[in-house]
Each structure stands twice: as structure tokens, then as C-alpha cells.
């Protein structure tokens, strides 16, 4: 008597995904088999790993394999594995009621035009079964539970019931009820083609139940019976009478007996045929492996639908022995920088036995995009995660993996087109490496690429920059900001560019962290053009003019400092401005304006740190600008002129904005601007305003307090 089934509803996102898979036309449906074989391989990995510390786990079935059984009569394709199996709660949770983190991300990618073959990268590969099947049953037996069956025709729900039919021992059996228009997936040749294409490097035997013919020798009357049937048919078809020769009966009987011994018939039978007999690719000589084989192995390893960008195959021998195969993918995974997610990019083997695929100590976090395998001869087979953390062998392997990755990236830099593809995807990883890896900082700095004031639309390396430096240039000049357009038009680069010096544009938030650790490159100090103390090479006449300007504007600087009070640390004459009247620079050791903006955007920022790390501001004025010169004349004429005070505040707030800072009271600043506009248009302050005007003016501080001062305002161009 069949057990009563429990019915469950699919979680909303999963139901939506299944609907998308079923109702959308996809040309490459064959990937369903790759995904199910990959899942089976993962289940086998898990039971093998558990058995290393507890061999009794394999008492329920010693042999580890994957088996494919096509049945044309029933219209089903069955995939069996002897892996870890699933408990009842695993079936309910993993196959329907709990959405994986990648479910939503995959749907969004699909709707944006991504390929269905990406499904495995998002952890929802099982549902690809519905590309070719209208009903799926999953029978599973875990060592810790009874045998259960999961079943669904994808109508928004699924059932789970206890299963008392043929026992599996341990593992999972998936039966796909193939759609009528997809029966080619029941053909042996098609299945072999797909396995060879996608799964030939799976580490367990993949067996296909094939139908064959063989000749069978018979010594009984079976062959005669078949022949008699055939002869009777022929007799009925002809009118000629049969003539018997009685005298020859004895001879005929003797001949018949001899003939019976030799007669053979053809019979059909089934047997398992192993489809993936290739030995692990990393154990072979790199000279004997084609790029196509590397490509197929990479896809099999990672579930990626695209080829890899670069590969490094090497072995280390001596006191320590291991082989490794490292790949750089073409694009970043959707969850590259999710801190809580455990990476499974580098698979660790010990003497060809899979140990684990999420060993965090195998490669540093900034290289977590690398994929591949490491096969050690020296680690113990039953090593635990805790033991790994203390293991000296692993530390040596890690050091070698980082070194070889650096070599691989360096080789990639020689191919400009491919390196651009790599850098577009993984530049943040390299920059994170500069921040975190002091041992490889200099090497990683070689890999960085930036726009500069001389590079146009192309990126260039710091080495290119240094090679173009002028004879009298001591430093590498850089500016950080939000975009190339913003920094290239910044007041800070005016004088540097006018002198013919190149400026590096750093426009990613992570660049701010890079320059905290990258203080110099090839002996040249990196100098920010937005911070105090900028020194530019100058001749005697320029030095003399600067000293004269300093003396000439000394009184204005003091006045501006007294007006601005603690808003700025000091006011000085600038040597970096050409077209702008003034700018705000920060102290050497505080944050730049860009870093301050980034930190203010942090949701969990430390307000105490904000207080002392926000750099002390310094106002620099341009002695050659007409606004500053006119302001000096007005201040010399009357230090107590209220218009001068308002103009100084207005200049300060405007330079804050143009230097990349934000205003504490933007509304007050806006009101000052509106008053200036009114004065410029000749609108009398005493003229009655409309309600809207009154609201917009708000509590704006007056620019001037009497009409006499108003006339002073109008004099400033």
C-alpha cells in the first residue's frame, strides 16, 4: 500500500523560475544533463569526504558512481548516484521551499538576456530538468533517514512521501519523464555526446546502460524452432509440392545434429558502458593537452558556459610535491564580494582523492575569482578543516599558488586586448591585493591601469607614466574623484597640467584605499594634487613671484582666516591654481574630499573616526584671479566692509563644492546665491515678494545690511 504523500508549495521565487524555464524557448536544453551529473558528483564528493574519517559511512554501498538509464518505451531518463543522499527535510528544503541566494539573481540575469547555461553558477541547476521533462521524481536515501520520493510536474507544488519500493541502499535516483518533443535525449548517441562535451572530467565513473547485440551459440532446439517457423512461412508462400527423399533421412539426421552444435543466433542484451575514462587532466603532461581539452575541463569544473581567459598548469617537486591547474574566468561571478559566502573555486585533492572545495586558506581573498584544482602528495587523506589551518604544507601550497597567479597575470598583460577584458572584470581584486598583500604589493602595482591627463581614452600603467616623466619631475601626481570628467576639469590639476606634468586619474572608491598603502612606485613618491604641500618644480623668477604674491596677499589671508574662523586651519596663496579663484585642500594625513564622501556614504560608519580623520581644511587663493585681486583691494580699503565678509563666505562655500566636499547647510548657500542673482538683476531688496519668493528666501542670511554695502557688491564682477 503506497504511503500517503504530503504536498508542499514551491517558494515564490522558485515557482517563478520554473515557470520561466518551462515557458521560454531555449535552444541549448542539453545543459540539464550537465547540471544533474554535476549535482551527483557533489553528492559523491560529500560521502567520500565523510568516509575518510568514518569508513562505516560506505557500508550502505562501497562503489561510488553515476549511472544513466534511458528507457524509450517508458519515455524516461534516469540518473542514479551512490552519493550522500537526501533526508526528507533535505528534499523539502533543497528542492522547493527554501530559495537559494542565486535564484533571484539568476532570474534577473535571464530576463536581461543571459544564457540559460549559466544556471549552475547560481546554485539552481536542478530545475533545468524541466527544460526537457514535464514531470520529475527524485528518490533519495540518506544514511540518517528512510527512503523518500519527491515528485512534481511543476504546477506550483510538489509531493514528498515515504518509499517502500526498490531500496537504493544510499544515494539518489532522478527520473525525468521526457517531453514528447525532446525524445532525442533518450538516444544513446545523444547522451554520449553531451557527457563527452560537458562532463568527461567528472571524478567518478559515469555509466550508461546501453543496448547491444551479440551472437549466441545454441545447442538446443531454439534455433530449429526459429528455422521451422521460417520454413513454414515459405511453404505457405509457394505452390510447389515438397519432395521427400526417404533414403537420405539417416544422413540428414546426422548432419542436423552436427549443424545444431554450430548454429548461432543474435540476441539483445544491456550492459553498463563507462563514458569518462580520461584520467585527471592535471596529472597529464601539459604538452600533451590541447586548449580545447583545457576549455572542456574548465567548463566541467566551474559550470561556466564560456571558455576561460587564461590557464596555468604546473607541478612543484622536491621536499613538497603537488600539481595544480589554475584558470582565470572571463567574467566576475554575481556574488564575488559577498563576505558570508564560502568560496568553492579551488578544489583540493590529496593523491587524486577529492577532499574539499571551500578551503579558504588555499588562496587569499583578493584572488577568490581564480578557479582550478590542487592535488597534493603530502597532505594526509583524512585531514580536517581545523588541521588544515595549522598545516605548513598548505601554507607552502598557498604561497606557490599566489606566485603562479602573479606569473599568469603578468603573461596576460602582454596581450593588450585580453588584459583589458581581464582588467575590466577584476581590477577591484588587484586593488584589494595592493591593500592587503604587502609581499606582492609592488608586483600588483605593475598590473594596475588608470586614465591619465595624457592617455586620452586608453588606460595606462604606472610604468608607462614613469617612462614619460619629465627630467625635472620628482613625483607621480594623482587625483582621486568620482569620474574622469570630474577630475580632469578639477581646479587642482590646472597648474600641474599647465606645467606639462601628467596626472593620474583615480576614479574608483577602492583607489582611496590603494593609495593609503602604495606610497611610491619605482622610487617615485605618489603625491596627491588635492593635499597641502604640493611642490612643483620652479625657476628663480617663478620663486620670486610667489614670494611677492605671498607678501602682497598676506593681509587678505589673515582677514579671510578671521572671517572663516575654525572652518579652515589656514588661508594661503596657492601655487596650483590657474583659472579658479580658490580651492580647499586637506592635510597630508587626513582624508581627501573624495574619501570623506565615501566614508559619509557608509551605513555603519564610526562617527568618532569621522571627526578626526576628516582632513583639516586649508583655503588656497589664486593671486592672479581678478575676483581675489578685487577682494584684496576692497579689504584694504575697508576691513569692516560687510560685503567682504559675505563674499569670503560665498567663495569658501563655492570652493568647498568645486573641491569635492559637501555643504553642511546647502539651503543657506542657495539663499546667498539667490540674493546675488537679485542684485545682479537690479531687483530692490525692499520690493514686495510673492509667497513663493518669501518661502524660497526663508531665513537666508543677508548679504548686506545697508544700501551702501549693496553698491559694493555690484562692483564685483
UniProtKB/Swiss-Prot annotation:
Q: Which GO terms describe its biological process?
A: cellular response to heat; centrosome cycle; cold acclimation; membrane bending; multivesicular body fusion to apical plasma membrane; negative regulation of cell population proliferation; oogenesis; pole plasm mRNA localization
Task: Tell me where in this chain the PTM Phosphoserine is found.
Answer: 219
UniProt effect for mutating residue 368 to K:
In strain: DPF-2, DPF-30, DPF-62, MA-10.2, DPF-82.1, 178.7, DPF-13, MA-4.4, EM-10, VC-805, MA-4.2, DPF-46, DPF-77, VC-815 and 709.6
The UniProt record gives the binding positions of ATP as 39, 81, 100, 126, 385
Q: Which UniProt keywords apply?
A: ATP-binding, Chaperone, Cytoplasm, Nucleotide-binding, Phosphoprotein, Stress response
Q: Supply one GO molecular-function term.
A: insulin receptor binding
Q: What is known of its domains?
A: The TPR repeat-binding motif mediates interaction with TPR repeat-containing proteins.
Full protein name: Heat shock protein 83
In its UniProt entry, the species of origin is given as: Drosophila melanogaster (Fruit fly)
- Kindly list the organism's lineage: Eukaryota, Metazoa, Ecdysozoa, Arthropoda, Hexapoda
Gene behind this protein: Hsp83
Amino acid at each position: 500500500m503506497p504511503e500517503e504523500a504530503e504536498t508542499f508549495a514551491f517558494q515564490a521565487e522558485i515557482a517563478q523560475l520554473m515557470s520561466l524555464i518551462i515557458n521560454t524557448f531555449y535552444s541549448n536544453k542539453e545543459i540539464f544533463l550537465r547540471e544533474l551529473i554535476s549535482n551527483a558528483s557533489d553528492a559523491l564528493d560529500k560521502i567520500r569526504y565523510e568516509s575518510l574519517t568514518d569508513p562505516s559511512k560506505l557500508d550502505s554501498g562501497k562503489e561510488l558512481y553515476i549511472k544513466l538509464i534511458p528507457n524509450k518505451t517508458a519515455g524516461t531518463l534516469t540518473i542514479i548516484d551512490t552519493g550522500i543522499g537526501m533526508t526528507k527535510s533535505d528534499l523539502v528544503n533543497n528542492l522547493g521551499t527554501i530559495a537559494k541566494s542565486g535564484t533571484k539573481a539568476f532570474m534577473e540575469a535571464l530576463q536581461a538576456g543571459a544564457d540559460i547555461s549559466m544556471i549552475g553558477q547560481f546554485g539552481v541547476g536542478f530545475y533545468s530538468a524541466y527544460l526537457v521533462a514535464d514531470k520529475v521524481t527524485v528518490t533519495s536515501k540518506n544514511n540518517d533517514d528512510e527512503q523518500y520520493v519527491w515528485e512534481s510536474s511543476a504546477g506550483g507544488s510538489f509531493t514528498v512521501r515515504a518509499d517502500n519500493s526498490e531500496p537504493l541502499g544510499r544515494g539518489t535516483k532522478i527520473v525525468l519523464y521526457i517531453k514528447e518533443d525532446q525524445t532525442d535525449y533518450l538516444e544513446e548517441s545523444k547522451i554520449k555526446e553531451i557527457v563527452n562535451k560537458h562532463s568527461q572530467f567528472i571524478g567518478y565513473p559515469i555509466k550508461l546502460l546501453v543496448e547491444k547485440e551479440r551472437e549466441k551459440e545454441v545447442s538446443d532446439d531454439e534455433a530449429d524452432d526459429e528455422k521451422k517457423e521460417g520454413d513454414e512461412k515459405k511453404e505457405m508462400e509457394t505452390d510447389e509440392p515438397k519432395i521427400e527423399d526417404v533414403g537420405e533421412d539417416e544422413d540428414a539426421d546426422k548432419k542436423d545434429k552436427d549443424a545444431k552444435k554450430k548454429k548461432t543466433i543474435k540476441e539483445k542484451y544491456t550492459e553498463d558502458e563507462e563514458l569518462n575514462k580520461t584520467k585527471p587532466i592535471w596529472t597529464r603532461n601539459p604538452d600533451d593537452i590541447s586548449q580545447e581539452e583545457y576549455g572542456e575541463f574548465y567548463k566541467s569544473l566551474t559550470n561556466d558556459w564560456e571558455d576561460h581567459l587564461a590557464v596555468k598548469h604546473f607541478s612543484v617537486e622536491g621536499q613538497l610535491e603537488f600539481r595544480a591547474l589554475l584558470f582565470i574566468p572571463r567574467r566576475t561571478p554575481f556574488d564575488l564580494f559577498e563576505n558570508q559566502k564560502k568560496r568553492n573555486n579551488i578544489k583540493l585533492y590529496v593523491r587524486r582523492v577529492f577532499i574539499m572545495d571551500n578551503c579558504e586558506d588555499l588562496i587569499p581573498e583578493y584572488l577568490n575569482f581564480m578557479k582550478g584544482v590542487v592535488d597534493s602528495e603530502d597532505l594526509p587523506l583524512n585531514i580536517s578543516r581545523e588541521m588544515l589551518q595549522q598545516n605548513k604544507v598548505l601554507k607552502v601550497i598557498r604561497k606557490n599558488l599566489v606566485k603562479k597567479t602573479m606569473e599568469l597575470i603578468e603573461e596576460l598583460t602582454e596581450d593588450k586586448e585580453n588584459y583589458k577584458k581581464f582588467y575590466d572584470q577584476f581590477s577591484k581584486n588587484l586593488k584589494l591585493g595592493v591593500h592587503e598583500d604587502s609581499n606582492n604589493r609592488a608586483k600588483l602595482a605593475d598590473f594596475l591601469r588608470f586614465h591619465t591627463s595624457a592617455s586620452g581614452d586608453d588606460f595606462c600603467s604606472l610604468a608607462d607614466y614613469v617612462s614619460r616623466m619629465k627630467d625635472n619631475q620628482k613625483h607621480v601626481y594623482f587625483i582621486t574623484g568620482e569620474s574622469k570628467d570630474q577630475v580632469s576639469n578639477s581646479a587642482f590639476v590646472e597648474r600641474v597640467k599647465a606645467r606639462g606634468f601628467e596626472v593620474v586619474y583615480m576614479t574608483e572608491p577602492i583607489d582611496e584605499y590603494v593609495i593609503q598603502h602604495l606610497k611610491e612606485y619605482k622610487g617615485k613618491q605618489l603625491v596627491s594634487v588635492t593635499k597641502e604641500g604640493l611642490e612643483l618644480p620652479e625657476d628663480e623668477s617663478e620663486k620670486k613671484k610667489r614670494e611677492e604674491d605671498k607678501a602682497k596677499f598676506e593681509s587678505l589671508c589673515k582677514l579671510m582666516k578671521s572671517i572663516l574662523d575654525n572652518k579652515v586651519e589656514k588661508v594661503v596663496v596657492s601655487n596650483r591654481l590657474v583659472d579658479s579663484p580658490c580651492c580647499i585642500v586637506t592635510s597630508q594625513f587626513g582624508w581627501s574630499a573624495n574619501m570623506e564622501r565615501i566614508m559619509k556614504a557608509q551605513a555603519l560608519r564610526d562617527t568618532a573616526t569621522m571627526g578626526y580623520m576628516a582632513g583639516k581644511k586649508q583655503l588656497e587663493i589664486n593671486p592672479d584671479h581678478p575676483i581675489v585681486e578685487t577682494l584684496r583691494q576692497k579689504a584694504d580699503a575697508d576691513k569692516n566692509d560687510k560685503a567682504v565678509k559675505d563674499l569670503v563666505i560665498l567663495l569658501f562655500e563655492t570652493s568647498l563644492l568645486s573641491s569635492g566636499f559637501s555643504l553642511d547647510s546647502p539651503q543657506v548657500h542657495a539663499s546667498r546665491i539667490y540674493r546675488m542673482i537679485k542684485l545682479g538683476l537690479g531687483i530692490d531688496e525692499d520690493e514686495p515678494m510673492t509667497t513663493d519668493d518669501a518661502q524660497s528666501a526663508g531665513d537666508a542670511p543677508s548679504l548686506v545690511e545697508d544700501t551702501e554695502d549693496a553698491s559694493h557688491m555690484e562692483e564685483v564682477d
